[in-house]
From Swiss-Prot:
Residues 1-20 are annotated as: Disordered. InterPro entries: Rbsml_bL25/Gln-tRNA_synth_N, Ribosomal_bL25/Gln-tRNA_synth, Ribosomal_bL25_b-dom, Ribosomal_bL25_C, Ribosomal_bL25_long, Ribosomal_bL25_short, Ribosomal_L25_dom, Ribosomal_uL5_bac-type. One of its GO terms (cellular component) is cytosolic large ribosomal subunit. This is Large ribosomal subunit protein bL25. It holds the Pfam family Ribosomal_TL5_C. PANTHER family: RIBOSOMAL PROTEIN L25/GLN-TRNA SYNTHETASE, ANTI-CODON-BINDING DOMAIN-CONTAINING PROTEIN, RIBOSOMAL PROTEIN L25_GLN-TRNA SYNTHETASE, ANTI-CODON-BINDING DOMAIN-CONTAINING PROTEIN.
Length: 207
């Protein structure tokens, strides 16, 4: 599991006015909650978070939150509020992580070997990814940044379901998996070719 460190400082002033001043200074108001400790208000460097939030790992990995240069606190991102039209993160929520408590996290799917699969090499075939992430349950030490889905054997007309995915050791789906809930993940089918537009009325009639 990769180590992703985020620097933070404790926040003394709270409220809308204080948050507005922080944003003007290039900082983001944030909070840490959960576990057996009280919530802690913190502030983050906007540039660091703006760059981090462009990566998958920021949403699905355990983050090492370094507050005031002290020991890192293990957290998960639980909410990130963006400005509706400006490139601005408004607020961030982190949840504390306990090493012996299972997590429920949405983990991205990475599809490999699609281009070299029978369906990928066939002409006139459309391959659609119905899901791009799955909700999994696991201990923090077992949390993967992503799960690979091998499409090397994908054929035209085939459907890959959740039950076909191989999950890492210690990782399982958060929801029940049965016939009714075994969702399609990848579908490979022939492209639909539309007929030419019908001839206009009277076209081709003899005069």
């Amino acid at each position: 599991m990769a180590n992703h460190q985020i620097k933070a400082q404790r926040r003394k002033d709270e409220g809308k006015g204080a948050s507005r001043r922080l944003r003007h200074a290039g900082m983001i108001p944030a909070i840490i909650y959960g576990g057996d400790q009280r919530p802690v208000s913190i502030q983050l460097n906007h540039e660091q978070i703006w760059l981090a939030q462009q990566n998958e790992w920021f949403y699905s990995s355990i983050l090492d939150l370094n507050v005031d240069g002290g020991g890192g606190e293990k957290v998960l991102l639980r909410d990130l509020q963006r400005h509706p039209y400006r490139q601005l993160v408004m607020h961030v929520d982190f949840q504390r992580v306990s090493s012996d408590a299972k997590l429920s996290v949405a983990v991205p799917l990475h599809f490999i070997n699609q281009a070299t699969s029978p369906a990928g090499k066939a002409g006139g075939v459309v391959i659609t990814h119905e899901l791009n992430e799955v909700q999994v349950s696991c201990l923090p030490k077992d949390l993967p940044e992503f799960i690979e889905v091998d499409l090397s054997t994908l054929n035209v007309g085939h459907v890959i379901h959740l039950s076909d995915i191989t999950f890492p050791i210690g990782v399982e789906l958060s929801t029940r998996l049965d016939k009714e809930h075994d969702m399609a993940v990848v579908i490979a089918k022939h492209a639909v070719i539309e007929d030419d537009a019908p001839a206009e009325e009277g076209e081709g009639d003899s005069k």
